[in-house]
A protein has these predicted regions:
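Conserved positions in beta-strands of structured domains
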Residues: 7-10, 75, 80, 94-96
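A residue-level signal for conserved active-site and pocket-lining positions in enzyme catalytic cores
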Residues: 9, 50, 113
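Short, hydrophobic/aromatic-enriched beta-strand segments in well-ordered soluble domains
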Residues: 22, 92-95
Length: 169
């Protein structure tokens, strides 16, 4: 089973911030068990939604240079609300610091404008071929996958404006 925690990218400013949404549906299988009479998105999956949004930001910031962008640390994570079916978790992540292999970000998730989760994340980025050159083709595939995923989830404002019908005077 594969989970998706970014349904759409609302805003993307490479090197600065990203805003994404996750629309929680009763179709999410884990809701049957978490919790049976009070279905809510598990906290660890809210953290994963922040991680996924942050990884898209890092990938776009560096023009998809790295095939692997993984969570290294989650600091000061606070859960402040529930995400129930029919609600939308809006995640915003901002880059605080870019270092050699690590990127530090501040991330938060809200539901209807109210805080649900926030924390600081450290993501580590690298290529598999850095340690195993034979995996260079896998790196290329994964980088292309990131690009394709972002192309499906985000349309820059200038593209949307170009598609808008022109009004004649």
């Amino acid at each position: 089973m594969q989970f998706t925690f970014v349904d759409r990218v609302l805003e993307l400013e490479p090197g600065v911030k990203v805003t994404t949404v996750k629309c929680l549906s009763m179709g999410e299988e884990y809701l049957a068990d978490h919790f049976p009479r009070f279905p809510v998105m598990p906290g660890v999956l809210m953290l994963q939604a922040m991680t996924d949004a942050s990884a898209l930001l890092v990938a776009a910031t560096e023009s998809f240079t790295h095939s692997m962008i993984t969570l290294k640390e989650a600091r000061n994570v606070r859960f402040a609300g529930f995400v129930q079916p029919g609600r939308v978790l809006t995640v915003t992540a901002e880059i605080l610091k870019l270092e050699d292999r690590d990127v530090e970000l501040k991330a938060r998730g809200t539901v209807d404008g109210r805080p649900a989760v926030n924390g600081r994340l450290v993501l580590e980025r690298y290529n598999l071929a850095d340690t195993r050159p034979i995996l260079a083709d896998t790196d290329a595939y994964l980088r292309q996958h990131f690009k394709s995923k972002l192309a499906l989830l985000y349309r820059p404002p200038e593209e949307i404006a170009a598609d808008a019908p022109r009004q004649s005077v």
